[in-house]
Amino acid sequence: APSLVGSEMCIRDRLNLLLQKVETDMTIFFRELCHIEEPKIEHLKYAFYDKESIPEKEWNDWLEEWWDRVEGKPNRKLMLDNNPKYVLRNWMAQLAIDAAEKSDYSVCKTLHDVLKNPYAEQKDFEKEWYQKRPEWARHRVGCSMLSCSS
């Protein structure tokens, strides 16, 4: 058992290093990992902001090791129960704030509805709310850059 723990830490450390190499939406990455049917990075590319800079061989090697470790049968229920599909992101909150400032509370209501069941698939909300940070939010204060005032 001790060697498994050491090996487990190694695979986790390698995952962390890989996730740092390319800008990744962690929520989408871990949610999509729950659904893969084979250890191929192509099934997870939606989670990356720059698909061209993905070190595919390194990713496929990691996925193969993980896949072998779970014997090709990841515990999907456990993974899905621990990786929400929908989380409140700064850009989503900003959309709700912008609309509310114009007396339109529909975005707040929609976000409230989505976030009541963050682990559910909710296909009706997928296109609008299951996505990486939009380009408009990349440099907008409050969406990607946060400040702290004292």
Predicted feature descriptions by range:
Residues 1-6:
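Single conserved hydrophobic/aromatic residue that forms the stacking wall/gate
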